Amino acid sequence: MKRFPVFIATVMMVSAMQAADKLDLKAITSGEFAASYVTGINPIDGTDLYASISNDGKQVISYSFKTGKQMSILFDVNAVKAPFEQIEGYVISPDGKKLLIMTHREAIYRRSFKAEYFVYDIAKKSLKKLSQGVNQQVATWSPDSRHIAFVKDNNLFVTDGDKETQITRDGKFNEVINGIPDWVYEEEFSFNRAFAWNADGTAIGWIRFDESHVKTYSLQMFEGSHPTHSEYHDYPGEYSYKYPKAGQDNSKVSLWSYDMKNGKTVALDVPVDSDGYYPRIKTSPDANSLIVYTMNRHQDDMRLYAVNPFTGKSKMLIKESVPKFVKEEVIENSIVGKKNILLPSDRDGFMHLYLYDMNGKLLRQVEKGNYDVTSIYGMDEKTGDVYFQAAKLNAHDRQVYVAHKNGKVERLTDAAGSNSAYFSGDYRYFVNTWSSYSHPYVFTVRSNKGKLIKTLEDNKQLLEKTRKYNWGKRETFSFTTSEGVKLDGWMVKPVDFDASKKYPVILFQYSGPGNQQVLDSWSTGSMGNGGAFDYYLAQEGFIIACVDGRGTGGRGAEFEKSTYLRLGDLESKDQVETALYMGSLPYVDKDNIGIWGWSYGGFNTLMSMSEGRPVFKAGVAVAPPTCYRFYDSVYTERYMRTPKENEEGYKVNPIERVKQQHGALLICHGLADDNVHPQNTFEYAEALVQADKDFKTLWYTNRNHGISGGNTRNHLLRQIANWFKQNLK
């Protein structure tokens, strides 16, 4: 009897606190829950130092790996009276005497951008603009620090700081590109620079893209706002660019080099199929060669060649051929060192590392086991130690490891969650970035034995803020589907969760090939930032759950490649199975389960709502592909081959099974989406109309695949939240 009033008072106090600190979408989308970072980390070659950009973006500062202490200010915006207010990036010259500083960055596509570049002489404290006229792209030091190469208006240039030389002259928008990739190469092979210096800076090689025969896609543009396009004040306009779709013509690619001494251009002869790819060109330790990667159109055969930039002759070094497809990460994570090539491969069923010499001879498999290597940091060629990240403990965890020459593998990080690293040039130290479901990013300096030297940033204030707002716990779970497949997931419950009640559930998923959303990281969650949007929805009375189905990453090649040739089939079955599992839990209202996702997650939302088992009462698809005939050639054919080769596989799509669509459906799309075109939603909307299905669409003026700018993201998330509030309660 005496305890009862105390209990009531406690509940009232907690309720008052929760009411006072209620999550707000405006706060979430304005960056209030954004983490702090240590930005622009660059190890300084030949030293035990690294550099980074100051928090205010006005300085480049060097620090000691050994002590963690600040050593010197390499550049200061105010001290040199720079004609810009902030640094947006920088590259230290190989000799350490100059900085190439980037500012006024202007995004083009996902990875590409134009910027205004300046060269800063550290000793002389002099600042000079790299080039006059329009802004440049991918400015890059030569290995001897004497020249900088860059691209301007689709042409390749070099400068020594005084004299600027134009190497190519045929570059033209929507026709010819030199030294930077076309749209599909950039998006699907994950790079934005298509040139490389040779080892001593006496030659430069590049990929030339002839996209004149690639079909054009046009996006309608309006005046809009944030930013405003005044040129479309009275009449809308168009942005037209080359976009090869599945089975259609790609750019015709060729390789060229320029001799810095005699000014001659040489055609490089590297064998590739007429419809194949050159997905990378890299510097080799030998000045008489460059390393070129080739890939056939099916993307199941990748080769590395050494090509002489002066004669154009080449020889094959390595051939990588695996069932179904070579993952894009094999190209992205491979490293050409001074004496060796490190190549990741899933040839034995899991992604592991293989060491080759510069003649292409396989020396050894670096490590083994039933786990995937997820990133490579490099090799200390003095000791033979190889440093990498792997999902060795489980599919949802990332740790940093070293594999010794004798085959012994040691773990260098100890905190469960997601760990990554920036190593010093001599591999004696590294900057460790760690986070987990419940803890924002922590940046520390460590020795190559894993010993903590200094904490650079711990995001303590953000952590305290999440506690102030009563963010709940992200609980993990597993279950087995009716097909005998074990799937893993997480869920977020309301803070005042009562197991005797029944709650509506919202499933969030991406489900795309190789992707993971069930990952013990602060980046996990439907909109990043520690999953702030998930906690907002939980605050509104929902349970939020996420499950990685078949085709996702971290569990080996068999699991990841199981969706080959039939994208959306198994993925949608697994989300339906997730809904059935959630519905079996005593605290879940099985009649009020929704699903949503963005991009591939939007595609799989539509597929799941038309899978045939009507388990979803509502769903939201953001920027969804609706038929892979509409999507780009490289991505789609990697997993599906061409429509001509796989007609039945391409029929597995939301449009084909629109009559089975079940549940209240909201589709959101940006009208300027250069990645997943609005065409996808337009065509699906027409199919829904003809099938006599009710639905709602939201269009965002001038917004690309990210759907942001001004108040846009706040508006979008409010529509998603309101849709589920209206239809699941």
Spans of model-derived segments:
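Blade-loop segments of beta-propeller domains
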Residues: 69-96, 106, 132-137, 321-324, ...
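Serine-hydrolase catalytic core recognition
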Residues: 215, 287, 420-729
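Predominantly five- to eight-bladed beta-propeller fold
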Residues: 25, 31, 68, 104-109, ...
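Non-catalytic accessory segments flanking enzyme active sites
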Residues: 38-42, 52-62, 72-74, 88-91, ...
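Short loop/turn segments that connect beta-strands within beta-propeller blades
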Residues: 65-68, 121-125, 160-163, 259-263, ...
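Asp-box/WD-like beta-propeller blade repeats and closely related beta-sheet repeat scaffolds
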Residues: 111-158, 163-194
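Signature of short aromatic-glycine-proline-rich micro-motifs recurring in repeat-based ectodomains
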Residues: 36-41, 85-91, 180-200, 280-281, ...
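Beta-strand C-termini and the immediately following turn/loop, strongest in propeller blades
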Residues: 51-57, 64, 92, 99-111, ...
